[in-house]
């Protein structure tokens, strides 16, 4: 718990030092929630979901990628909007 709190504080400080940058969740469905500051003036976060034989996979990150047919994509423009 302390590690997670420290990580969030560090990410917040880094984001504030760089000016207003977008903060997005960046984990896959099988991992614990994490966030990242988007670089290069990126202005969108995404959540991508697709079915597999073992269940639905969810991937999150910065940007708004092009996806193949059958993959659900949600792009958004506010901090941590891709949960």
Curated annotation (Swiss-Prot):
Pfam families: Toxin_cobra-type. Disulfide bonds join 24-45, 38-62, 64-75, 76-81. Residues 1-21 form the signal peptide. The keyword Signal applies. GO terms for molecular function: acetylcholine receptor inhibitor activity; ion channel regulator activity; toxin activity. GO terms for cellular component: extracellular region. InterPro entries: Snake_3FTx, Snake_toxin-like_sf, Snake_toxin_con_site, Toxin_cobra-type. SUPFAM superfamilies: Snake toxin-like (SSF57302). It is found in: Secreted. Keywords: Acetylcholine receptor inhibiting toxin, Disulfide bond, Ion channel impairing toxin, Neurotoxin, Postsynaptic neurotoxin, Secreted, Signal, Toxin. The keyword Disulfide bond applies. Binds to muscle nicotinic acetylcholine receptor (nAChR) and inhibit acetylcholine from binding to the receptor, thereby impairing neuromuscular transmission. Belongs to the three-finger toxin family. Short-chain subfamily. Type I alpha-neurotoxin sub-subfamily. This is Three-finger toxin W-IV. It comes from Walterinnesia aegyptia.
């Amino acid at each position: 718990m302390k590690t997670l709190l420290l990580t969030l504080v560090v990410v917040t400080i880094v984001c504030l030092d760089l000016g207003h940058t977008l903060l997005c969740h960046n984990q896959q469905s099988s991992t614990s929630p994490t966030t990242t500051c988007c670089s290069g003036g990126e202005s969108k976060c995404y959540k991508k979901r697709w079915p597999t034989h073992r269940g639905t996979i969810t991937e999150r990150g910065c940007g708004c990628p092009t996806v193949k047919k059958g993959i659900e994509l949600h792009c958004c423009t506010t901090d941590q909007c891709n949960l």
